A protein has these predicted regions:
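Phosphate/diphosphate ligand-binding glycine-rich loop within oxidoreductases
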Residues: 66-145, 156-160, 175
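Short, well-ordered beta-to-alpha junction loops that form the rim of enzyme active sites
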Residues: 4-6, 74-76, 172
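Generic structural signal for helix capping and beta-alpha/helix-loop junctions
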Residues: 32-34, 100, 123, 150, ...
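Rossmann-like dinucleotide/phosphate-binding beta-alpha-beta segment
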Residues: 155-179
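Short gly/ser/thr-rich secondary-structure transition/capping motifs
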Residues: 49-56, 71-75, 147-155
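N-terminal glycine-/charge-rich "phosphate-binding" loop or analogous flexible N-terminal tail
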Residues: 1-70
């Protein structure tokens, strides 16, 4: 198992407790430089530590990938992972959704892809969803415009009363059920 994520000692112990024969290689942060070079700045700045530039040589990183049969990854990921990990059979991604993998070469390949759907903090995302509903229902975008303009135009507000309304939640997975 090759971990491209920074994992804690507790997480390492949990993985190795599954089977003592598991060889776990911790390469968390090793590929950050490559990720920074291949993803837009807004992505790498948000998801990578500011001083993360990777570790090891290109040859060492290529060797790690070439030998990996199972990879634990995250977001953002290496776009050319399948091409470089010829023995790869299984890629597990920590984020819940897999559609973000469309950009890379894993999508549509022979590699089994799994995600951590259901093990994240879905309640926090559901609360952000409710906050978004309230944001627009109460006219907060107009309030921002008024604040910038330095005046309040009460006629521009059309707040919506949410009480008694019915909402349709499409795709009621873990987050949708919490909403």
């Amino acid at each position: 198992v090759l971990s491209l994520l920074r994992i804690t000692a507790e997480e390492r112990a949990m993985i190795q407790a599954v089977d003592p024969a598991i060889k776990l290689t911790d390469a968390g942060g090793w590929f950050d430089g490559e990720i920074r070079e291949t993803w837009p700045p807004f992505t790498s700045e948000r998801y990578l530590p500011p001083d993360a530039n990777g570790a090891g040589s290109q040859e060492e990183r290529d060797h790690l990938l070439a030998e990996a049969e199972v990879i634990l990854g995250g977001w953002p990921f290496l776009l050319d992972l399948r091409a470089r990990a010829k023995k790869l059979k299984w890629f597990h991604q920590r984020p819940a959704g897999a559609s973000n993998l469309l950009r890379g070469d894993l999508w549509g390949s022979d590699v089994v892809v799994t995600t951590s759907r259901g093990s994240g903090n879905t309640l926090a995302m559901a609360e952000y969803t409710v906050a978004g509903i309230l944001h627009f229902a109460k006219g907060l975008p107009q309030a921002a415009v008024d604040r910038e303009a330095g005046h309040f135009d009460h006629r521009a507000y059309r707040p919506l009363q949410i009480h008694g309304k019915t909402a349709l939640v499409v795709g009621a997975g873990g987050i949708g059920q919490d909403v």
